[in-house]
Amino acid sequence: LRAMTFPERGLMLKALALHLTSLKATYYPVSAQSGATKVDSWIDIDGGIGNLFAYATLRREFQDLPYYVEGQPARLSREGSFIGHHIMLPKRGVAVHINAFNFPIWGMLEKIAVNLLAGVPAVVKPSEYTSYVTEAMVRDIIASGILPEGALQLVSGKGRGILDHVQRGDVVSFTGSKATGYALKQQPLFMDRGVPFNLEADSLNAIVLGPDAHPESVEFGLFVKEVVREMTVKTGQKCTAVRRAMVPEDLLDAAQAAIAGRLSKTTHGDPSVEGTRMGSLASFEQIQRVQDAVQILSSNQTLVHGNLDGSGNPTGNHADGAFFAPVLFRCDDPYGKTKAHDVEAFGPVCTLMPYKSLSDAANLVAKGKGSLVTSIVTADKDVAKTFTLEAAYSNGRIHILDASCAKESTGHGSPMPLLAHGGPGRAGDGEEMGGMRGVMHYLQRTAVQGHPNMLSHIAGQHLPGADRPEASPHLFRQHFEEVKIGSTVTTESHLVTLKDIDEFAELSGDKFYAHMDENALDGTIFTGRVAHGYFILSRAAGLFVDPAKGPVLLNYGIDSCRFTKPVYPGTSVHVKLTVQEKINQEKRSEDDIAKGIVKYYVEVIDDENESVAVATILTMVRKLDQS
């Protein structure tokens, strides 16, 4: 796994995602045994597979190497013969994932997608309550042979002793309750052995209705719908579920009536029964845990919907499932009566409370001591900005919802693979996913120093100061396999004239005064009419391109471009075209042309031997081997 390049690992994830997609229908009946509705299972199964696809796509953000070359080199000497750079290599241990019961598939796939792309194998310990769902998929993953042998291992059951064997180079991540997570995090072995411990704990997440809303506004309806959805999807068993709903104090009664009214129409019970919108808790043990938390919450706030024991009228046979009907509390004094800020009932339970101002709302959110996510529902951009900047410090994510994005919004409770998932304080102070950010948790950053030739060889890309041997034949006559990093074409010179400037202005329509009006240059940096930067770049292409048909298929684009010095009529310019980096591309079909991307560093140099323009261009180049 470590020897594979990032693109190869990404293609491995893509193949795995496609394979699991072909089998996903077989996981739904298994998921239903956990009390999940079809929607709940879709979030878990399809959402989890979606994470694999997302991280497979990220392969394009990394170099075609088994390790990552980070950022830009640092010049450490006057003449440039000694430089520094950073490389990030896969850690030599394993990723140990201790997962929660609520999302037995998504919880596994959202983590292993990251460590597998990084080149680190995983040991997964699912919750014993729903491990049978995880096991069904892991069995298929192992049987597929898509992953290298041993890259994924499953440990079911209590998992006692699993942490006794972790060593330097391993990474441990935990998702679950605050109490269990804190107990694990405090074990001295993590400090003694230098093992990172990433904690993502359940938190008292909030949703805030903006002061611009009123009962007839679209945003009021969105708020009510979001609260009810977060209470009932997965029966409220989500680490991101809304536990505290905050509204302007003059809207408290209206919000209570609307939320309770919508909850009363929510059918709960056996997910196999047609029309059931909310399933059961994951186990009978969870009923007691939720009931205990509800009893504590009821000690200083008012029950306005449901029953304290979670009783209701579930569909199906009541004895067959861990059914718990939605419970809504109201707390009129959220500063004096604080149980809602301290106690989480991990089920379909939420507390409604008032606020007086936006800063007051942000303060109430922060009383949860750190949350994974808070939503603000508002149509006012100033409200959204003010609240976000005030509340962000106590949250891992701020979800802004209004009518303009509601149709496509992924919702309050859905962490996205390319965004960081985690939160401060009670939420664990950890971070998962986040696109490339997540991959970095499984890589060791190392600074390397030396001559640019040495570091260029390590980095797999040409670095400033490294040798640039003249290419023979011309680079455009070489196939992808033949092109060498650092090979350079030095062109003939071109004398820039006023005629060039006039003709380019006429052709392009760019008649900016600095190019055309020598009487308008007072107070500028220019001493005369200056050539267009894009003319210099275009003329550079005319100098370095070998126009005859050959291995180069097309110009793929420009990554960066800078015009570093004015070019005046009478200046001669030439180009150095240097191979900066090579990126292999996979064939999309049997008929596809085998090819790769070659990044060229283009340096335009004047007759004083100074750079006037630099750019990185990309070309698509045919391979010799078309198999």
Model regions and ranges:
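Catalytic strand-loop segment that frames the active site of acyl-thioester-processing enzymes
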Residues: 472-531, 623
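N-terminal Rossmann-like NAD(P)+-binding subdomain of aldehyde/semialdehyde dehydrogenases
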Residues: 1-80, 265, 282
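ALDH superfamily catalytic-core signature
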Residues: 140-145, 169-171, 180-335, 358-359, ...
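Short, well-ordered beta-strand elements within core beta-sheets of diverse protein domains
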Residues: 1-2, 76, 96-97, 207-211, ...
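Rossmann-like NAD(P) dinucleotide-binding subdomain of oxidoreductase/dehydrogenase enzymes
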Residues: 63-222, 355, 408
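Hydrophobic beta-strand-centered segment that forms part of the acyl-chain substrate-binding groove
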Residues: 524-581
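Conserved C-terminal structural/oligomerization subdomain of aldehyde/semialdehyde dehydrogenase
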Residues: 5-11, 126, 146-149, 168-169, ...
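HotDog/MaoC-like acyl-thioester-processing domains
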Residues: 475-488, 563, 567-627
